[in-house]
């Protein structure tokens, strides 16, 4: 019996083996495990082994949880949880998946709190698509500090947070009020973190918090300098009460005028005379000792300028008439200048732009500009011809000076500079560089006097066609458009720099002067008023522009030198622009003169009159003088007052010859 049972058992076992299983159920393979590879909050990767390093998670980004295998997406919502550690509050999350369901994207329903620790847990409920398992995992991260924002800013009562320009700030007991988005940490409101800086350093101030530490009042306890730039600074070391971070903040502002004048107030006529006399000193006291010529600028040493010296010669006439010097002194200086010009380098009669005041040798103005400069020569001859007309031919000594001026005048070969008879004048020529500069003189700009004198020359004149085809470019110099409802007859839009209205018209009288292209009084007045109106409108919002502080022309600036104009406005006001425009805008120019002297005199007035330029926006004032800027001030003020230089130049017989030839009327 026992043997029989054994046989049955063996048979049953063999049958089971043949069927592959004794219970008719397939075996399940051992399940794998999911591997967590990365957790990121936005782009900020968490340290999965040391949560204490997770200190700067953003508050406004989703959480990315990356695994090695494809997930069972139906389990994710139950498996992932985010809590606020301090309160246990559960953060609502919405889920999506990336990377072929290997990445969970958990998007918080609201922005996370700043300066808060969060606990992220992933339970073992999470499964892989292949039933891979995952052990419980928990980590923590700390969010970045909150942002401390400036909600409002007023400087001396003026809203300043979103204003393009804060100007006219009071000079005394100035208050700056700042409201923050959060209470600030009082310990961070110290003078090293919050201060106002001026040209002379940090301004003493008091710092007071109010309104539960969310408002800061800065009171400046020292009187500010007028018409100056100041800078409010709040460093990133200013923190909120909960460590909220403030982005380093700066704000410029500009102070108002001081009602107290810098110098005693004098009559308008006395002020005009004072400015003429002080400016004249540039050409008298600072003239080159050997040659009597005008130095290019107050730092030029032996470098003298031909055109600027022409302006200086005109200024000497004013100096004599205004009794700044005697007539004899003026004649002696003219004699010295003529001695120099008669032996200085000339190129077909034209002098170079720059000359060595000791030797008379050319000093190159540029690499290829080492010869005659016809435009500078015309400015020089404008001065010499005017002085010739001032001299008394009945006096033998003065007649000798007249003869010497005529000799120089008659040997300027204006026609040579047509470059072989072309209908245009060329600016430069030198023996070795020849015509390499290739600079045709075409209008409209400061060079009208060059063509006028070329036409007036008794020995080397030009045909009228050179003027009409070259200078006037067959009429293309015309403009005719309106700017600020002011018609501009000639030139580029807005007229260009104001020296266009000065250099040619130091001697050439624009009153009632016209030709086929324009009335030149209208041209110069309208050009000036466009420049003035532009400055008052101040479209670029520069500090310091007003109906008193105006005038754009060529001058020094904080970066070097430029021809400033409404289309090249760099925030630089140049006194010669308004002051040399006295004939064209007497009221506006007088306002500017009083502003320059009484309001800016402490920084702008110097030994030779007003320094070259200033830029209140950048807190800059030039320390330079230029002959071509100082000369027109003396001369055009005199033309405004008496017409002296205009009357003298226009009395020259050659002037009428040129007017007839070119079709001018007066």
Regions found by a protein language model. Give the residues of each.
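Acidic, low-complexity Ser/Thr/Gly/Pro-rich repeat segments typical of extracellular/periplasmic
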Residues: 26-260
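Bacterial N-terminal signal peptides that target proteins for export
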Residues: 1-9
């Amino acid at each position: 019996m026992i043997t029989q049972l054994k046989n049955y058992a063996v048979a049953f076992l063999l049958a089971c083996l043949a069927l592959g299983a004794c219970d008719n159920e397939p075996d399940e393979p051992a399940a794998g495990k999911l591997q967590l590879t990365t957790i990121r909050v936005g782009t900020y990767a968490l340290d999965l082994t040391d949560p204490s390093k997770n200190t700067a998670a953003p508050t406004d980004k989703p959480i990315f949880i990356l695994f090695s295998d494809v997930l069972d997406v139906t389990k994710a919502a139950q498996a992932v949880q985010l809590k606020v550690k301090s309160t246990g509050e559960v953060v609502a999350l919405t889920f999506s998946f990336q990377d072929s369901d290997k990445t969970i994207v958990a998007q918080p329903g609201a922005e996370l709190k700043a300066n808060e620790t969060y606990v992220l847990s992933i339970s073992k409920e999470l499964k892989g698509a292949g039933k891979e398992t995952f052990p419980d995992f928990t980590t923590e991260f700390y969010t970045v500090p909150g942002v401390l924002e400036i909600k409002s800013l007023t400087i001396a009562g003026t809203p300043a947070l979103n204003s393009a320009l804060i100007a006219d700030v009071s000079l005394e007991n100035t208050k700056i009020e700042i409201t923050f988005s959060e209470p600030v940490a009082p310990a961070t409101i110290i003078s090293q973190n919050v201060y106002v800086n001026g040209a002379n350093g940090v301004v003493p101030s008091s710092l007071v918090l109010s309104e539960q530490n969310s408002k800061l009042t800065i009171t400046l306890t020292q009187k500010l300098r007028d018409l100056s730039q100041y800078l409010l600074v709040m460093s990133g070391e200013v923190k909120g009460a909960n460590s909220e971070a403030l982005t380093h903040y700066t704000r410029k502002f500009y102070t108002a005028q001081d009602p107290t004048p810098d110098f005693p107030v004098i009559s308008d006529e006395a002020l005009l005379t004072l400015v003429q006399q002080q400016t004249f000193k540039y050409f008298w006291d600072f003239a080159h000792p050997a040659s009597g010529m005008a130095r290019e600028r107050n730092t030029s040493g032996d470098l003298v300028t031909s055109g600027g010296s022409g302006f200086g010669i005109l200024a000497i006439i004013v100096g004599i008439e205004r009794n700044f010097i005697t007539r004899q002194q003026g004649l002696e200086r003219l004699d010295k200048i003529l001695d120099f010009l008669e032996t200085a380098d000339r190129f077909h009669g034209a002098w170079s732009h720059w000359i060595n005041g000791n030797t008379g040798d050319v000093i190159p103005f540029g690499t290829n500009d080492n010869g005659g400069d016809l435009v500078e020569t015309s400015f020089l001859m404008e001065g010499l011809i005017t002085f010739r007309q001032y001299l008394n031919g009945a006096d033998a000594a003065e007649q000798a000076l007249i003869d010497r001026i005529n000799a120089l005048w008659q040997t300027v070969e204006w026609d040579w500079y047509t470059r072989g008879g072309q209908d245009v004048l060329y600016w430069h020529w030198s023996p070795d560089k020849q015509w390499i500069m290739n600079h045709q003189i075409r209008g409209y700009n400061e060079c009208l006097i060059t063509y006028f004198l070329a036409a007036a020359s008794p020995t080397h004149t030009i045909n009228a066609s050179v003027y009409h085809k070259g200078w006037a470019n067959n009429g293309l110099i015309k403009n005719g458009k309106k700017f600020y409802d002011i018609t501009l007859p000639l030139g580029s839009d807005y007229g260009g720099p104001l020296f266009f209205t000065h250099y040619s018209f130091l001697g050439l009288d624009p009153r009632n002067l016209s030709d086929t292209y324009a009335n030149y009084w209208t041209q110069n007045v309208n050009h000036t008023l466009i420049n003035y109106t532009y400055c008052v409108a101040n479209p670029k919002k520069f500090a310091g522009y007003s109906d008193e502080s105006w005038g754009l022309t060529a001058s020094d600036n904080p970066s070097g030198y430029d021809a400033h104009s409404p289309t090249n406005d760099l925030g630089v006001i140049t006194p010669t622009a308004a002051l040399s425009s006295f004939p064209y805008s007497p009221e506006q120019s007088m306002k500017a003169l009083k502003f320059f002297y009484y309001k800016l005199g402490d920084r702008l007035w110097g030994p030779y009159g007003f320094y070259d330029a200033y830029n209140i926006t950048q807190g800059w004032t030039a320390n330079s003088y230029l002959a071509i800027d100082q000369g027109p001030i003396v001369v055009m003020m005199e033309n405004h007052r008496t017409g002296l230089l205009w009357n003298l130049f226009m009395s020259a017989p050659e002037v009428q010859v040129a007017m007839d030839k070119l079709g001018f009327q007066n």
